[in-house]
Amino acid sequence: MAQPTHSEIQAVDPVLTNMLVGYMQADDRFIASRLFPAVPISTQSATYYAFTKKYWFLDSLQKRAPGTGFARSGYGVETATTSAALWGLEHPIADETRNNNQMPMDLERAGLQWLAQQSLIRKERAFASDFFANGVWGTTDNNSATDWDDFTNGDPINDVLTARRVISNNTGQDGNTLAVGYIVHQAIVNHPDLVDRVKYVQLATMANVEGAIAAAFGVSNYLVGKASYNSANEGQTFSASAIIDDDALVCYVAPQPGIMS
């Protein structure tokens, strides 16, 4: 046999330079920033004003007798405070590690993408904890007997229309947004009531189907939260968990948050 052998002169297999397996989630799987657009502030804490709602729904005009003055009325103003907590994370790269890197991707770029993913996960989890929760909103339905994956008793269209009507009556704005977890989206697309309404979509692309679902619910925005995270501790076996699970939120979202919106 000819010597030296292949295994003797090649201590390790060559590194592929055109392939690198990754598990980074696409940005559009996260919906927090799309559901509630950020309002930038110049200080960590701030005070903001709000008109007192009840005055804007009063029927205050009164008849005026000839030669008399008009009845007078007005509106109230309230203040509230907000505080922006500072979150951060470092990903140090030692010079020795950088110099010995054999991956077909520089470590700074990989680290930047990893940090961006960490930021998205933290924001999405905080968002889900704060807003997909009982007691946060004026109306909550936690009746498992009418879940939307129950194709006999579940009635997603009526539930959403009812929620939109409640929002309209209490705010003067029509609920224009429905946000759901991925498991809820799967129940919706398979529900007979929705299937019957979207079956004539010209081309059953994901965008067309989701647009037809939004139209069936009467909302402008239909958002599906698909992001997941590792719920195990760092040293434990990976455990995938949906950030937004079997939840749905109907709300009004100002297209461009600002003064009087």
Identify the residue ranges that each predicted region occupies:
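N-terminal alpha-helical "arm" segments
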Residues: 1-37
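N-terminal leader/assembly segments
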Residues: 10-12, 47-73, 89, 98, ...
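Assembly/oligomerization interface modules of large self-assembling protein complexes
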Residues: 22-91
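Intrinsically disordered, low-complexity boundary segments flanking structured domains
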Residues: 32-38, 73-80, 162-167, 206-213, ...
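Residues in well-ordered beta-strands of folded domains
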Residues: 49, 83-85, 90-92, 179, ...
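Alpha-helical scaffold segments that mediate packing/assembly in large oligomeric complexes
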Residues: 95-177, 182-199
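Extended oligomerization regions of viral-like shell subunits
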Residues: 173-261
